[in-house]
Amino acid sequence: MSKLDSLFTAALEQAAQRQVRRRLRHAAATPPGRLALDGRTLVNFSSNDYLGLARHPLLAERASLWATRHGAGAQASRLVCGNLDLHEQVEAKLARLKGTEAALLLASGWQANAAVLPALFKAAAAQGEPQVYTDRLNHASLHHGCQAAGVRQIRFRHNDLAHLEHLLAERAGAPGARFIVTESVFSMDGDRADVPALAALAARHHAFLYLDEAHATGVLGPRGMGLAGLAPGGVDLAMGTFSKGLGSFGAYVAGSRALCDYLVNACSGFIYTTALPPAVLGAIDAALDLVPRLDQARATLQGHGERLRASLAAQGIDCGASSTQIVPAIIGDAGHALALAAELERRGLLAVAIRPPTVPAGTSRLRIALSAAHGEAELDQLIEALAAGWRAVRQAA
């Protein structure tokens, strides 16, 4: 028992009253597209394993092989003595695929955004306080990185490039380096940024474009390498993850050689973290071999999204501006979203309810994450369950 347990308990009770308390549930591995949860196998529509690679035999084989050959851990941070040839091999392969001069591995997407942004703003401080323009719906890790650096965010309306350009023009004569920080695919809404237009806007206003590609990597863009590929040379830094479309773990930044060398020297999340272990590197390496060849899987995934969005629209369920494998069923009330998720689970489907503070108040939803591992029969099951479940929730309200 700790000295602050009474405070912790009170906070949990308040969260429960607001219907936003979370609890961990026991999950076990199953074939792609499914999940054993609390001892029951469900069709999984909540996973970020968009291409079904997390259970791909090549990833498992190479992870095992590299661990056997090179050990279970890297033993230290890369600047001390943990910089293996494997790290540089994977970074070189990734840079070739991304079409950038260099790439740098990091431990997670959250760590990348939380640590890379402060490092960038520190370098820019020589020109005065940086101007940091951020999308209002950016991921929490991007906001955290800005807050950790102590910079003021100039927020533009979601995906509204006219508003962004207006804000930039308003401050045209102000000192300080300019940064535009946004996502290519937004994790809770499934919509995408117009990356070529963003890149052109950034060029006009001499702004550094930071693009979070966590939910695009593997799934969208040329060879599945993200939407930055639609604007060659126009994105200054692309951040992405290996834990979603690539089925493994970890994150990266890709950009110029000078940028990556600077981050080796200035990014706390790189400097003070033990390097990724050989098994993880092996899985990443295998995924990078597979992903460029998975055009059919990507086409299947986009087809699933189009079909589901049409079904939700026919049922009167708002799915926002989704155009990707992430399809929100926006319910509004947190209690109704929880009830719909429970109805789906009763019918053998997992689609987790997302509530505040993850999404704004009044926009609670089921975040439906599709996978190329889902078949048409499973999509049929989801569509039927959503229709029946939504009727049941409305009748009970």
Curated annotation (Swiss-Prot):
- PANTHER family attached to this UniProt entry: 8-AMINO-7-OXONONANOATE SYNTHASE, CLASS II AMINOTRANSFERASE/8-AMINO-7-OXONONANOATE SYNTHASE
Q: Which GO terms describe its biological process?
A: biotin biosynthetic process
- Residue(s) carrying N6-(pyridoxal phosphate)lysine: 244
Family per similarity comment: Belongs to the class-II pyridoxal-phosphate-dependent aminotransferase family. BioF subfamily.
Q: What is the lineage of its organism?
A: Bacteria, Pseudomonadati, Pseudomonadota, Betaproteobacteria, Burkholderiales
Cofactor names: pyridoxal 5'-phosphate
Q: Which Pfam families match?
A: Aminotran_1_2 (PF00155)
Keywords attached to this Swiss-Prot or TrEMBL record, sorted alphabetically, are: Biotin biosynthesis, Pyridoxal phosphate, Transferase
- UniProt lists the gene as bioF
Q: What is its EC number?
A: 2.3.1.47
Quote the record's binding site residues for substrate. Answer: 22, 139, 358
**Function statement:** Catalyzes the decarboxylative condensation of pimeloyl-[acyl-carrier protein] and L-alanine to produce 8-amino-7-oxononanoate (AON), [acyl-carrier protein], and carbon dioxide.
Which PROSITE patterns does the entry mention?
AA_TRANSFER_CLASS_2 (PS00599)
| An annotated Gene Ontology molecular function | pyridoxal phosphate binding
Reaction(s) the record says it catalyses: 6-carboxyhexanoyl-[ACP] + L-alanine + H(+) = (8S)-8-amino-7-oxononanoate + holo-[ACP] + CO2
What general EC class does the enzyme of this chain belong to?
transferase
Annotated protein name in UniProt: Putative 8-amino-7-oxononanoate synthase
Residue positions binding pyridoxal 5'-phosphate: 109-110, 187, 212-215, 241-244
What is the protein's quaternary organization?
Homodimer.
> Pathway, per UniProt?
Cofactor biosynthesis; biotin biosynthesis
